[in-house]
A protein has these predicted regions:
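Helix-loop boundary and gating motifs at the non-cytosolic
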Residues: 6-63, 248, 252, 256-281
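Hydrophobic core of transmembrane alpha-helices in multi-pass small-molecule transporters
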Residues: 100-134, 364-378
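C-terminal ends and interior cores of transmembrane alpha-helices
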Residues: 90-114, 347-360
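Loop-to-transmembrane helix entry/capping segments in MFS-fold secondary transporters
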Residues: 50-51, 148-158, 308, 391-403
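Intracellular loop-helix junctions on the cytosolic face of multi-pass helical membrane proteins
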Residues: 1-15, 108-122, 131-134, 138-141, ...
Length: 454
């Protein structure tokens, strides 16, 4: 029977060793940022309405629910002297992710075979599956290579790199339009050129970042793991059991990610139709199809596309805040404990989401992003730091994959029910979905205080 021995036998790693180990996450998160900031926009450009948007976003959590535990299970059992344990999954996932990043903004080019929306949903599924193949082993890699006293630092550095990648990805469409004059308001096209080229650049950076981690990171061999006492030589026959702490963290994750999902799906629509009182994109484009020279409709189209770019800026800002705040998390956690640190961050995130409803213009929307960025930094680091200390090393990958259930299930729940709620309870006003998300995150704050981990 296997017994987990002291994790302090793992070598202490330097800042730059941890940085290199997590650098691939910069590319992964740039891909996620492009998806989060532009998928709703692309889908509405292809003809989706606000009530059906959340249904398309079901693709992401469903693929994560299926893919991550499988990848975690097999990466725990994979070893190649040449390629390692987790790194083969990084590379294969990156290949398919880059393909999906190139294909999604070009979904309209395949309409001779299938409807554009169906093609877009298919490419979105490929993208999410590939992201998950690359992403899941990264969480396990940090826990594999770091002793327990460096877990918070490791996941915080990972969060900082996630933030940097997300800032670049979120800002990219705006930068291409405003700095390099790549157009964003061409009539008659489904997806604007600045968005398309942003996805191409994202694909290149994604692959480059993954390759950096592959070539710069060493993994412990099975023999080294036994020699250092990380795992026992004997095969485990213990009954598979999820620790109580993992269930408690799962409840926190449920309410946290429900709130985040509401923000990702509905911010663009809320900014356009609640803050600026614009007609739907479907209405604007239908009007231009009948009267292409209508000046009012043209100006509304331009403003709508500019606001779509601005959502990328807003998402980039909260990710930038998270990248900065991540460096302070280990210090704060040492002083107040991991649970209280995470609870405070979630409190700020819930406040920020509710605050978005009351902002009078796009510039004012920056203020709530500061609070959301603090919550995002903690969400990406603290649950994993708390979890890593209570699960066996030899099952790190599969447990991290199972823990992903508590991220994907709330997104599935939100995708199934938030659309009808917005339509029937909120009268089609997507801004109320942001308030609902904020309330859920406040519940996450309360449940975090029940977890007793220093």
């Amino acid at each position: 029977m296997a017994t987990e021995t002291t994790k302090g036998t793992k070598k202490q790693l330097s800042f730059w060793q941890i940085w290199n180990m997590s650098f691939g996450f910069l590319g992964i998160q740039m891909g996620f940022a492009l998806q989060n900031g532009n998928a709703s926009r692309i889908l509405t450009d292809l003809g989706a309405n606000v009530e059906s948007l959340s249904w398309f976003w079901l693709v992401a959590p469903l693929t994560g629910l299926i893919v991550q535990p499988i990848i975690g299970y097999w990466s725990d059992r994979t070893w190649s002297k040449r390629f390692g344990r987790r790194k083969p999954f990084f590379f294969v996932g990156a290949l398919f992710a880059c393909l999906a990043l190139i294909l999604l903004p070009n979904a309209d080019n395949f309409t001779a075979y299938f409807p554009a929306l169906l093609i877009g949903a298919g490419f979105l599924m490929l993208m999410d599956a590939s992201f998950n193949v690359s992403m899941e082993p990264f969480r396990a890699l940090v826990a594999d290579n770091l002793p327990d006293n460096q877990n918070t630092k490791g996941f915080s550095i990972q969060t900082a790199l996630i933030g940097i990648g997300a800032v670049v990805g979120s800002f990219m469409p705006w930068i291409l339009n405003n700095v390099f004059n790549v157009p964003n308001n061409i009539s008659g096209v489904k997806v604007q050129p600045n968005v398309i080229y942003s996805f191409y650049i994202g694909a290149a950076i994604f692959m480059g970042a993954i390759l950096w981690t592959i070539f710069k990171t060493k993994e412990y061999s099975p023999e080294e793991r036994i020699e250092m006492g990380i795992v026992s030589k004997e095969k485990t026959k213990e009954k598979f059991k999820i620790p109580a702490t993992m269930w408690k963290l799962g409840l926190v994750q449920f309410f946290s990610w429900f709130g985040l999902f509401c923000m990702w799906v509905y911010t663009t629509t809320a900014l356009r139709e609640h803050t600026y009182l614009l007609p739907t994109m479907e209405t604007i484009k239908a009007g231009l199809a009948l009267n292409p020279s209508d000046i009012t409709l043209k100006s509304q189209l331009k403003l709508s596309e500019d606001l779509g770019d601005w959502v990328g800026i807003l998402f980039g800002i909260y990710n930038g805040v998270s990248a900065i705040f991540a460096f302070f998390i280990p210090m704060i956690a040492r002083k107040f404990g991991r649970s209280k640190t995470h609870a405070l961050a979630l409190l700020m995130g819930g406040f920020g989401l509710v605050l978005m409803f009351f902002m009078p213009n796009k510039t004012a929307m920056i203020f709530p992003m500061l609070f959301i960025g603090i919550a995002w930094a903690s969400i990406l680091a603290m649950p994993y730091a708390m979890l890593a200390g209570v699960i066996p090393s030899e099952r790190m990958g599969v447990f991290m994959g199972i823990f992903n259930f508590f991220i994907t299930l709330p997104q599935i729940f939100s995708a199934l029910f938030s659309g009808p709620i917005v339509k029937h309870l909120f009268g089609g006003n997507a801004a109320y979905a942001l308030v609902m998300g904020g309330i859920f995150m406040l519940f996450a704050c309360i449940f975090t205080l029940r977890i007793k981990i220093k």
